[in-house]
């Protein structure tokens, strides 16, 4: 069981705390986090997960002080991930090389290391629940692959995820 845990680097503190708690519960239930090693939401999900229940995809070696020498961290993006990101990004031609690598990294967060195993669901935060920033790439990919998206910036998604989290919590008691 896997989930993608991502979102804005500017995620409000109340949601960062909630993300860490949610990650702890999901980790206890056996879910493996897929995230991207960025500050903000990514780091909150990562902090709540144990090392054996997280897989972190970084766009290049040393991103945010992380290394593929660390357990559960994978570095770099392949041509296929880059092509997939290009196909869903609305303004690819305006992205720098670094931005393109960051968007391609998002492909792994949703589809896994082999780009063939969609997460069970995606948790994120964007202001107002909008498809914005790098998170939008992951949201679009998730939706295209039938992955349910729960955006904590959308009150309806919060309510729906709360129901799912109750079910997951009951399964580990």
Where are these regions (language model features)?
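Glycine-rich ThDP/TPP pyrophosphate-binding loop and its adjacent helix/strand module
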Residues: 158-173
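Acidic/glycine-enriched connector segments
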Residues: 1-4, 9-162
